[in-house]
A protein has these predicted regions:
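A domain-level signal for caspase-like cysteine endopeptidase catalytic cores
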Residues: 1-72, 108
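Hydrophobic alpha-helical scaffolding
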Residues: 12-16, 29, 44, 84, ...
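Catalytic cores of nucleophile-dependent amide-cleaving enzymes
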Residues: 62-163
Length: 205
């Protein structure tokens, strides 16, 4: 599993301090810590995340998790991107340079990763759809901005279900949609606002 976490602010975007908590939740849930590759941003000037390293890791991993800002380009979907300290990880780069031979699931804990074109919703190319094209048959995304406080709760409940068998047997990617349902139900039952739990969506198997 590859986890890419970007807690720092940049390019006019607010910091995402709870992404560090999100990573802690992943560490606690993954059955074998040696199967987790971490990329944690510290800012553009202090050891920025390498896009080349990310793309290389994505080609080999089974699970990929991104906790960062995301943006959907209004006129050129190929310029839609996950925003990292090392640069913009655009749809174009993902499509051109990433074909995940072992890919099973991509979890995009970032804003607008599944936001579509209001005028052509059936034709929109989103970041979530791009991960499907890149070789991940199951993808979790968001239709609009998500709460930084809710993200670790959703991720924790999601991976609690996916990794519930520990090292006895590998996670079943076909249960990703149900795992997301359980995770969203958890924050919904806590009394959070409607627009905080609705954005989470699943695509694929």
């Amino acid at each position: 599993m590859v986890a890419v976490i970007e807690p720092t602010s940049g390019s006019g975007y607010s910091a995402l301090p709870m992404t560090k908590v999100e990573l802690e939740k992943i560490r606690a849930r993954i059955p074998a810590s040696n199967n987790l590759i971490e990329h944690v941003g510290k800012g553009k000037t202090i050891d920025p995340i390498s896009l080349d390293n990310i793309l290389s890791n994505l080609q080999e991993c089974s699970f990929a998790h991104f906790g960062c800002h995301g943006t959907q380009h209004p006129s050129n979907p190929l310029e839609s991107a996950l925003l990292l300290s090392g640069g913009r990880l655009t749809m174009e780069k993902l499509i051109q340079k990433c074909q995940a031979s072992n890919g099973s699931l991509a979890y995009l804990s970032a804003c607008q990763t599944a936001k579509s074109d209001e005028e052509r919703p059936d034709e929109a190319l989103t970041l979530a759809a791009t991960m499907l094209f890149a070789g991940f048959p199951s993808v979790v995304g968001t239709m609009w901005s998500i709460s930084d406080n809710d993200a670790p709760v959703v991720a924790d409940a999601f991976y609690a279900h996916m990794f519930r068998h520990g090292t006895e047997r590998p996670p079943d990617v076909t249960e990703a949609a149900y795992a997301l349902h359980l995770a969203v139900q958890k924050i919904r039952d806590s009394g959070t606002e409607f627009w905080n739990w609705v954005p989470y969506v699943h695509f694929g198997v």
